């Protein structure tokens, strides 16, 4: 999945993956992580997600990472905020009270760039990546996060043979195989979301399961 694909989607306004409201699973399960207010929370491939505003409103300092400058600018415009913009290496950093978004290639970020993040939140990053990039994503996430950390991860699982991503299917078996060595993986919620996917219904899928995981680094 090349960067140009996502840049073109944002440029054309083809952002069906964007949720205009705060994710209900985030609101329901975030407290399971027991993250102390004031901690830094990484949100990879954040887009203009309202979930960042919710996390900031709970007292966390949000550290977003996003490829599309258009997405970042729209986020702050819709919040009615004028961010302070600086250049940090290959990144343009947009900052406002309670949030900073690093605009550039997520895989070029370093732990030094983002500081000590006690937790991460991923609703749209892992499922945005095809299978050949997901393992690299996990490895880079582990390089960014400290040893004592946790995360809330939301994925989808469906018959990938019937429907091309994105969003891509992330089988539970794959997740446990790749992540269980360094993380305690606990499924805390989930539901069949096929009824809300016009593409899935048209493709003849029987299910499109959403899985919600709490991850604790071990």
Swiss-Prot record:
GO molecular function: thiopurine S-methyltransferase activity
Xref: PROSITE patterns: SAM_MT_TPMT
Keyword hit for Signal: no
Keywords per UniProt: Cytoplasm, Methyltransferase, S-adenosyl-L-methionine, Tellurium resistance, Transferase
Classification via Gene3D superfamilies: Vaccinia Virus protein VP39
GO cellular component: cytoplasm
The protein's role, per its UniProt record: Involved in the biological cycling of tellurium and selenium. Tellurium resistance (Ter) mechanism.
Protein name (database record): Thiopurine S-methyltransferase
Organism: Pseudomonas syringae pv. pisi
Gene, per the UniProt record: tpm
């Amino acid at each position: 999945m090349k960067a140009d694909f996502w840049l073109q989607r944002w440029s054309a306004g083809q952002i069906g993956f964007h949720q205009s409201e705060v994710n209900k699973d985030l609101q329901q399960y975030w407290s399971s992580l027991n993250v102390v207010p004031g901690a830094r929370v990484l949100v990879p491939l954040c887009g203009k997600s309202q979930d960042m505003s919710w996390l900031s409103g709970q007292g966390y300092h949000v550290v977003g990472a996003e490829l599309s400058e258009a997405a970042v600018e729209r986020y702050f415009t819709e919040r009615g905020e004028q961010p302070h913009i600086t250049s940090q290496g290959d990144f343009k950093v947009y900052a406002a009270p309670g949030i900073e978004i690093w605009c550039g290639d997520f895989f070029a970020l370093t732990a030094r760039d983002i500081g000590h993040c006690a937790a991460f939140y991923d609703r749209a990053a892992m499922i945005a990546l095809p299978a050949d990039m997901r393992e690299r994503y996990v490895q880079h996430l582990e390089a960014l996060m400290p040893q004592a950390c946790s995360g809330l991860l939301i994925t989808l699982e469906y018959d990938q043979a019937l429907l091309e991503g994105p969003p891509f299917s992330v089988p539970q078996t794959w997740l446990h195989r790749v992540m269980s060595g360094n993380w305690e993986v606990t499924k805390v919620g989930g539901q069949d979301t096929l009824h809300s996917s016009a593409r899935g219904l048209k493709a003849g899928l029987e299910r499109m399961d959403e899985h919600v995981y709490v991850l604790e680094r071990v």
